[in-house]
Amino acid sequence: MSDRRTFLKKTSLAGLAGLLPMTSLLDGNFDAPSVLNKDSETTWADGSRLVVSVSMQFEAGGQPDNAESPFPQNMQKGFIDLPGASWYDYGYKEGIPRMLDNWDALGIKVTSHMVGSAVLKNPKLAKEIVDRGHEAAAHGMNWSSQYNMPYETEKKFIKDGVDAIKKVTGFTAVGYNANWLRRGTNTLEILQELGFTYHIDDLSRDEPFLIKVKGKDFAVVPYTLRCNDIVLVEGKNFSADQFVRQVKMEFDQLYSESERKRRQMSISFHDRIGGTPQMVSATKEIISYIQEHKGVSFKRKDEIAQLAYADKSIIRE
């Protein structure tokens, strides 16, 4: 993931914008669209008041040599960053197994975005994720950027990742997440052609919606940077307590809004970050807090996409 630190710095600035009072956004000529008066049309079809979507990124093992890590990026060419590699190894040796046990203890199912090469390197772990009832979604074959790939090259890149997941787990991925969300102008057409039903590379809403791709409906299940460990913990150096506080504040606001409109909350964890002892403890506190509230359901992203397709009141763009 090249330029990761630059990306994280930029998202830090974007996060500050989210702390501005809403009145500051409305002082000019900006007209905020409102659907608050459409109570009966914007609830979840299954009766949920608020739906929470948890992501577990399975990337470790698929990273390139000398990928960015917490260590200084000053390795000379021709040498291997051994401690950096061990940081990634933690993701599949300790991180995902610990998170899987935590999901079981909490009684929730998540969506795991799997890098194809990581799956092939750790097939037993990938299969265990699916065997425990979680969704396997595609995340490319490796950490390459795909936005600049020619059509057929990108199609093969995506399909190779899907095939790896299918071969190892028996699960056919229907959801997609590009490297750093950076899809290209051809990506959605390719996904539709390959049989995908949704993608998550969009930050524009706090609820799912449908778009048209070559005249056919395609679901968008929005992702998050605000409740994302790679942005907050690795990027902004949040402590576990700060992470808990921010995610709880996000939930409280969305839960309040969900009394009047359809709301989705997304939380994202990465194998080598979200799977550390303190972060799993923080996650347990967050999920337990959310579960204390009536009307909240936890759903895999493929389930959310299916609800979107079946809902006549879903937003269409």
Residue ranges and their predicted role:
Residues 35, 198, 210, 248-317:
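C-terminal domain-boundary segment and adjacent tail
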Residues 52-54, 136, 297:
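Residue-level marker for buried hydrophobic side chains located in beta-strands
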Residues 78-80, 97, 104-185, 208, ...:
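Metal-dependent polysaccharide deacetylase catalytic core of the NodB/CE4 family, i.e.
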Residues 1-8:
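Twin-arginine (Tat) signal peptide motif
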Residues 149-157, 238-242, 278, 282:
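Alpha-helix N-cap and loop-to-helix initiation/capping positions
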